[in-house]
């Protein structure tokens, strides 16, 4: 149902001219084919007449052939002219389309520019410049460049801190005192024969010991 209300494209004078030229080109092409057939036929007739020793008729056929060839050349030129005309129309149509596009683009630019207030644009540019100047000044205060001497001191301090960290992370070297403290806490080696306690002496050992003590020493 929707197709019933579609508006047909309007045929312009350019469309009619293009259609006419294409029709003429098609007719000229058909005429070329006809002339080529006539030329070939006259050529074949001349061969046959020469074979029959009919020189006059053979020459007449060749004259007709030449006439048709000249006409074919003229038709070829007409076809070239038609093709050139079609090319010019197509090029001109494209140029017109480009011109219309440029015209619409120019109108769009003017419409956008009409919505821009020059005072607002100038104010925006001034605000942007002020903000940039403030930021540059702030960066200059917070990030002043250091002198060469300051840079050398910073590098030296960095090397010092790095060396300290390396030393701190290394395991400690044991000293003599720490080695002695780490020795096992063993008892001293006895220098005298250990004497057993009375509780550990048996009755037999006690009697023997008493007897020995009671015996007189030899004179």
UniProtKB/Swiss-Prot annotation:
InterPro entries hit by this protein: Snf7_fam
**Please, which domain of life does this record's source organism belong to?**
Eukaryota
Q: Bias regions of kind Basic and acidic residues — which residues?
A: 174-186
Pfam families attached here?
Snf7 (PF03357)
Which GO cellular component term is one of those annotated? endosome
Spell out the Polar residues composition-biased ranges.
194-209
Which family does the record assign? Belongs to the SNF7 family.
Give the record's subunit note.
Component of the endosomal sorting required for transport complex III (ESCRT-III), composed at least of VPS2, VPS20, VPS24 and VPS32. Interacts with SKD1.
What is the protein named? Vacuolar protein sorting-associated protein 20 homolog 1
Instruction: Write down the species.
Output: Arabidopsis thaliana (Mouse-ear cress)
């Amino acid at each position: 149902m929707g197709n019933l209300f579609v508006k047909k494209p309007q045929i312009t004078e350019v469309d009619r001219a293009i259609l006419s030229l294409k029709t003429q080109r098609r007719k000229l092409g058909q005429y070329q084919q006809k002339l080529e057939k006539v030329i070939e036929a006259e050529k074949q007739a001349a061969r046959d007449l020469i074979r029959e020793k009919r020189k006059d008729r053979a020459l007449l056929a060749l004259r007709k052939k030449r006439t048709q060839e000249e006409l074919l050349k003229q038709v070829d030129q007409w076809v070239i002219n038609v093709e050139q005309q079609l090319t010019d129309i197509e090029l001109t149509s494209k140029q017109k389309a480009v011109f219309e596009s440029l015209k619409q683009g120019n109108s769009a630019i003017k419409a956008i520019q009409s919505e821009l207030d020059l005072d607002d644009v100038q104010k925006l540019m001034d605000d942007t410049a002020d903000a940039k100047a403030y930021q540059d000044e702030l960066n200059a205060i917070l990030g002043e460049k250091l002198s060469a001497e300051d840079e050398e001191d910073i590098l030296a301090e960095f090397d010092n801190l790095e060396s300290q960290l390396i030393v701190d992370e290394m395991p400690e070297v044991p000293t003599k005192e720490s080695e002695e403290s780490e020795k096992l806490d063993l008892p001293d080696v006895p220098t005298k024969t250990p004497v057993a306690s009375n509780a550990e002496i048996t009755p037999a050992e006690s009697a023997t010991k008493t007897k020995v003590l009671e015996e007189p020493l030899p004179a």
